[in-house]
Amino acid sequence: MAQIKITLTKSPIGRKPEQRKTVVALGLGKLNSSVVKEDNAAIRGMVTAISHLVTVEDVK
């Protein structure tokens, strides 16, 4: 299955609690931290909810 790299580019400070929890659930901590996750519907939904805070790249 394909993988995606998710990078936190903006701070979740001052955002809604649901958005902050989503950032933590993805395993992102500090700014510019990155994680590689499987590309599935659940992860895509989480990324969509915080798309204004993260950047997404395909991993080969």
UniProtKB/Swiss-Prot annotation:
InterPro entries: Ribo_uL30_ferredoxin-like_sf, Ribosomal_uL30_bac-type, Ribosomal_uL30_CS, Ribosomal_uL30_ferredoxin-like. PROSITE patterns: RIBOSOMAL_L30. Keywords: Ribonucleoprotein, Ribosomal protein. SUPFAM superfamilies: Ribosomal protein L30p/L7e. One of its GO terms (biological process) is translation. HAMAP family: Ribosomal_uL30_B. Belongs to the universal ribosomal protein uL30 family. This is Large ribosomal subunit protein uL30. It comes from Streptococcus pyogenes serotype M1.
